[in-house]
Amino acid sequence: MYKLVLIRHGESQWNLENRFTGWTDVDLTETGREQARKAGELLKREGYAFDLAYTSVLKRAIRTLWIALDALDAMYTPVGINWRLNERHYGQLQGLNKAETAAKYGDEQVLIWRRAYAIAPEPLDLEDPRHPRFDGRYAKIPADQLPATECLKDTVARVLPFWNESIAPAIRAGRRVLVAAHGNSLRALIKHLDNVSDDDIVGVNIPTGQPLVYELDEDLKPIRHYYLGDAAEIEAAMAAVAAQGKAKKD
């Protein structure tokens, strides 16, 4: 049996402000740093150790990983950083407040933009300074692979090659792997691992800073999965994620 641990980055500044973040490179809040520290301490307390870790090129995920590994007394752990683990790109929605956007367009439309499997928001214009082609960290990525917007289907297509070429072979080689990434890149992995339907993935919400453990058989099929930590706290955090895209009630 193999084990894989997934963790969504701790609360970011734009999580706090309830804004669509996507590929915008915002940092963790103090709460987010504390979540990452507690995640690392929990993993250490439960006896987890890692041979290899992976994360995205966005600082909120990188810093979460650093802080968690520090709490594990394991900052020597080799880390693979790859853009394919980035958050889903939200196109023109990036930077907008989710509740204000819901008040303008309706809760249902925002839910579609946030969670529909195959519907993407309007793309960024090629000349928009937020377009990833203007960001030096993507300079070596072919321009036709850089998204101006994505739906979850696109995110799955981006993430799975990295799973197949890097993460899965490492697990099969017996390496204990930790992945610190984002809500939607992790939803992409979960959809693949659990064979979640296009309809059911809409209801999957991943809380920030909570380690999710997958026990996998020799074919990397899930035997079971579970969050570490307090069940009530995790349920409340999931509900909070689900409510982010709803208009505020007066």
Swiss-Prot record:
UniProt entry tagged with the keyword Metal-binding: no
GO molecular-function term, one example from the UniProt record: phosphoglycerate mutase activity
Keywords: Gluconeogenesis, Glycolysis, Isomerase
UniProt record similarity statement: Belongs to the phosphoglycerate mutase family. BPG-dependent PGAM subfamily.
Residue numbers marked as site, Transition state stabilizer: H182
Active site: H9 (tele-phosphohistidine intermediate), E87 (proton donor/acceptor)
Protein source organism: Bordetella parapertussis (strain 12822 / ATCC BAA-587 / NCTC 13253)
One Pfam family cited in the UniProt record for this chain: His_Phos_1
Known role: Catalyzes the interconversion of 2-phosphoglycerate and 3-phosphoglycerate.
Pathway given in the UniProt record: Carbohydrate degradation; glycolysis; pyruvate from D-glyceraldehyde 3-phosphate: step 3/5
Subunit text: Homodimer.
Protein name: 2,3-bisphosphoglycerate-dependent phosphoglycerate mutase
EC top class, as a word: isomerase
GO biological process: gluconeogenesis; glycolytic process
Chain positions recorded as substrate binding sites: 8-15, 21-22, 60, 87-90, 98, 114-115, 183-184
InterPro entries assigned: His_Pase_superF_clade-1 (IPR013078), His_PPase_superfam (IPR029033), PG/BPGM_mutase_AS (IPR001345), Phosphogly_mut1 (IPR005952)
Catalytic activity of the protein: (2R)-2-phosphoglycerate = (2R)-3-phosphoglycerate
EC number of the protein: 5.4.2.11
